[in-house]
């Protein structure tokens, strides 16, 4: 910082600084000195400049190469992800189709099972009805037989008196004698 301040202070004492312009005289401009300085800069600075440019070029090329590699890797990963996505879509479609067919199959099985249960219940109901009909018929037969027997006994008791009783006995005795005489 002190150097810069000193330079500014001392520059005020320079007489050239006050008169700045373009000098067109070649001999006064010292073109040869400038050419020598530029030539030396080119000759000695060429290696350094070439090294700097070469290093910069290598850095840029390696950066481009890395970017291309990352791009290729990203492209590969994207393609792999797309393939996985397609496989997942196919798998999802298969699962959906299998699910729908499974639902249809289970629906048919449930309908068949319900039909079988309904048929079994209908058969059981019909068997129960037939059994109850048979039981009712049997009860009616027994009741009719009992009533017929009671009426027959009542009728016999009303008609059967001692005279009829004697005649029936005599008749049967006569039949037994007739059978006995034919068998001799």
Curated annotation (Swiss-Prot):
GO terms for cellular component: chloroplast thylakoid membrane; proton-transporting ATP synthase complex. It is found in: Plastid, Chloroplast thylakoid membrane. CDD domains: ATP-synt_Fo_b (cd06503). It is a single-pass membrane protein. GO terms for molecular function: proton-transporting ATP synthase activity, rotational mechanism. F-type ATPases have 2 components, F(1) - the catalytic core - and F(0) - the membrane proton channel. F(1) has five subunits: alpha(3), beta(3), gamma(1), delta(1), epsilon(1). F(0) has four main subunits: a(1), b(1), b'(1) and c(10-14). The alpha and beta chains form an alternating ring which encloses part of the gamma chain. F(1) is attached to F(0) by a central stalk formed by the gamma and epsilon chains, while a peripheral stalk is formed by the delta, b and b' chains. This is ATP synthase subunit b, chloroplastic. It comes from Physcomitrium patens (Spreading-leaved earth moss). The gene is atpF.
């Amino acid at each position: 910082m002190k150097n810069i301040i000193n330079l500014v202070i001392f520059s005020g004492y320079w007489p050239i600084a006050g008169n700045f312009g373009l000098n067109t005289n070649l001999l006064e401009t010292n073109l040869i000195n400038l050419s020598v300085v530029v030539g030396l800069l080119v000759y000695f600075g060429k290696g350094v400049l070439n090294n700097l440019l070469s290093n910069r070029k290598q850095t840029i090329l390696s950066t481009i190469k890395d970017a291309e590699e990352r791009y290729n890797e990203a492209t590969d990963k994207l393609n792999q992800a797309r393939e996985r996505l397609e496989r997942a879509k196919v798998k999802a479609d298969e699962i959906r189709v299998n699910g729908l067919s499974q639902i249809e199959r289970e629906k048919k099985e449930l309908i068949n099972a319900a039909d079988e249960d309904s048929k079994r219940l209908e058969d059981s109901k019909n068997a129960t009805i037939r059994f109850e009909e048979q039981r009712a018929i049997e009860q009616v037969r027994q009741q009719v037989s009992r009533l017929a027997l009671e009426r027959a006994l009542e009728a016999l008791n009303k008609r059967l008196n001692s005279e009829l009783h004697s005649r029936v006995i005599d008749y049967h005795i006569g039949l037994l004698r007739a059978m006995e005489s034919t068998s001799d």
